[in-house]
Every structure is written in structure tokens, then in C-alpha cells.
């Protein structure tokens, strides 16, 4: 497909041989939201190639959506599906969740409570749901060895600048002040105890 659209880099036979002979130590997987697709119903109108040349986005009308991030779909089951795909179709290589995060806007996170902590319980609940699915996948043989939740502090994004927040700590863009979120305390306990109790 890439060759058909003139998107492959120029390589020598030696380059190709080196790439083909190399082993992967482990794979890093970034996951935020599922992406559903359907066959194109309209003409592709860009003058350069993107994968959307072959499909359009599709929305599941019965889906569950994040009210704090552009109504992106929430589908914890997708973590299990990713793990099963790597296990069943890619030799069950070692991998880890290099990025997973739950976006909220500044207003949705609210202000710190009396204890000085920003209460982002919504984020914790969703992370728990996703990690339950990852635990289930590991129990079913997936070779996942770790999770890196995005991210330490609210940061700039290529897509949303500072519109969406992911951090364990809030960053005040005017003053540089940092305020801890409840999610940070939860994740610290999770990392220390290597688990949590869930009824999910």
C-alpha cells in the first residue's frame, strides 16, 4: 500500500537485509481511544496520502463516550483486544502500554478540595476499567510487562496544545504552580502494591 502511494523511504538492499534480520526486544503500544472505521462513502479529497484514503471514521451510536474530551468513545475492552491480537498474530512478543491516559479539560477537573488535591475520580474509574481488561488479557496469556500512564504533569500536545489535561499534576500556565490530582495518589498506591481491588 505504501509503495502504491509512493510513501516508502529510499533504502538499499543492505538496509532491507538489516531490518529483516533484526529482532524486536519489545513493543510499545499507545492507546487512548478506539477507532472504528467503515468503507468510504465519499470521495477522498486530500491531495496527499493518508490511511483515510481507504476508510472513513465510524461512530458506534450505542457507545459510551467521554464527556470531558470531545465525546471520544470509551471502550476498555479494546485493551484486551489489542493484547489478544499481539498474542495471536504477532508471536506474543513482549510489550507494554507505553501511553495510556484519560483526557479531561481544566474546568472538568475542578478546583482543589480542602485537602489540596484535585478530585479527578472520573479518570481513576476509567483507568481501573482499562487495567482490569489488561489483567484479564495477561491471565489469558498476553505478554504485557508494564504500563506507563500519560503523564506526570499537564503538558503540551501536538493535537490539542494545553486544551486537554492528562497529568498526575496540574500545571498552572500563568504561574508555573503545580497541584496534585487524586489520580496521582491512586497510581502511586497502585505501583507500590502492584494492584487494586475492583468489582469490575
Label every model-predicted segment.
Residues 1-200:
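Non-catalytic scaffold segments within catalytic domains of secreted glycoside hydrolases
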Amino acid at each position: 500500500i505504501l509503495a502504491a502511494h509512493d510513501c516508502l523511504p529510499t533504502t538499499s538492499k543492505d538496509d532491507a537485509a538489516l531490518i529483516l534480520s533484526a529482532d524486536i526486544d519489545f513493543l510499545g503500544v499507545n492507546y487512548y481511544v478506539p477507532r472504528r472505521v467503515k468503507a468510504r462513502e465519499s470521495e477522498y479529497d486530500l491531495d496527499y496520502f493518508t490511511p483515510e484514503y481507504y476508510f472513513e471514521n465510524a461512530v458506534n451510536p450505542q457507545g459510551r463516550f467521554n464527556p470531558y474530551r470531545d465525546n471520544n468513545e470509551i471502550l476498555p475492552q479494546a485493551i484486551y483486544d489489542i493484547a489478544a491480537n499481539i498474542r495471536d498474530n504477532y508471536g506474543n512478543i513482549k510489550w507494554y502500554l507505553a501511553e495510556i491516559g484519560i483526557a479531561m479539560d481544566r474546568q472538568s477537573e475542578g478546583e482543589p478540595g480542602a485537602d489540596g488535591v484535585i478530585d479527578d475520580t472520573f479518570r481513576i474509574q476509567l483507568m481501573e476499567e482499562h487495567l482490569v481488561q489488561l489483567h484479564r488479557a495477561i491471565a489469558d496469556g498476553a505478554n504485557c510487562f508494564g504500563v506507563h500512564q500519560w503523564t506526570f504533569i499537564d503538558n503540551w500536545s501536538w493535537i490539542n496544545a494545553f486544551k486537554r489535561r492528562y497529568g498526575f499534576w496540574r500545571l498552572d500556565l500563568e504561574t508555573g504552580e503545580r497541584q496534585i490530582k487524586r489520580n496521582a495518589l491512586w497510581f502511586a498506591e497502585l505501583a507500590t502494591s502492584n494492584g487494586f481491588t475492583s468489582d469490575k
